[in-house]
From Swiss-Prot:
Protein's recorded name: Frenatin-2
Tissue specificity of this protein: Expressed by the skin glands.
Family statement drawn from the similarity comment of this UniProt entry: Belongs to the frog skin active peptide (FSAP) family. Frenatin subfamily.
Protein's UniProt keywords contain Secreted: yes
Organism from which the protein derives: Nyctimystes infrafrenatus (White-lipped tree frog)
GO BP annotation list: defense response to bacterium; innate immune response
Task of the protein: Antimicrobial peptide with selective activity. Is only active against Micrococcus luteus (MIMC=50 ug/ml) and not against Bacillus cereus, Escherichia coli, Leuconostoc mesenteroides, Micrococcus luteus, Pastewella haemolytica, Staphylococcus aureus, Streptococcus faecalis and Streptococcus uberis.
UniProt main location, coarse: secreted
Highest classification ranks of the organism: Eukaryota, Metazoa, Chordata, Craniata, Vertebrata
Keyword Secreted found: yes
Positions where Leucine amide occurs in the chain: 15
GO cellular component annotations of the record: extracellular region
Amino acid sequence: GLLGTLGNLLNGLGL
């Protein structure tokens, strides 16, 4: 993802 610090789950999926 883009912001792994703010949302590891969401950003991890590419959201």
